[in-house]
Amino acid sequence: MDEKREENILKKQEELRLFQEALPRKGRLAGLDVGTKTIGLALCDSQWIIASPAETIRRKKFTLDLELLRQFVEKQQVKGLVIGLPLNLDGSDSPRTQSVRAFAKNVAPLSLPVLMWDERWSTKAVTRTLLEADASRARRSEVVDKMAAAYILQGAIDSFAMF
């Protein structure tokens, strides 16, 4: 294994450890797929076993987006956020990476632990699944963001057991 890859794995393990330490032993987590027009939301159970799509926020301006997210977090009793990080296929930052990192910093008023999670392939995987299920274009556009959020969240909670 090359040195840079090993360094990245160790860094991700440390991020996961810190995130888990900041969380209560049990409680729901929310997954977010942050786009320019929408924010897909997903939830997992309090045991961190299964993630499910929840809803989609149509973005307007950040203060309104944050208020809708705050309401969702309170209603669902969310204890931590897993936010999809849009990286290029080679792992480098994409044009959207910086704006998603800024979004993650701007949700600080929610006072929740935040984990940034590699979201490469999430939307493509979900779209492929929906195509295989013969979902119409309208149905795909209606659910793809919250399903991508569930895909991101499931990846994160699956990794909890590994590290």
From Swiss-Prot:
SUPFAM superfamilies: Ribonuclease H-like. Its main location: cytoplasm. Keywords: Cytoplasm, Hydrolase, Nuclease, Ribosome biogenesis. GO terms for biological process: rRNA 5'-end processing. Transmembrane segments: none annotated. Gene3D superfamilies: YqgF/RNase H-like domain. Its EC number is 3.1.-.-. It is found in: Cytoplasm. It comes from the Bacteria. Pfam families: RuvX (PF03652). One of its GO terms (molecular function) is nuclease activity. It is an enzyme of class 3 (hydrolase). Could be a nuclease involved in processing of the 5'-end of pre-16S rRNA. This is Putative pre-16S rRNA nuclease. It comes from Zymomonas mobilis subsp. mobilis (strain ATCC 31821 / ZM4 / CP4). The lineage of its organism: Bacteria, Pseudomonadati, Pseudomonadota, Alphaproteobacteria, Sphingomonadales.
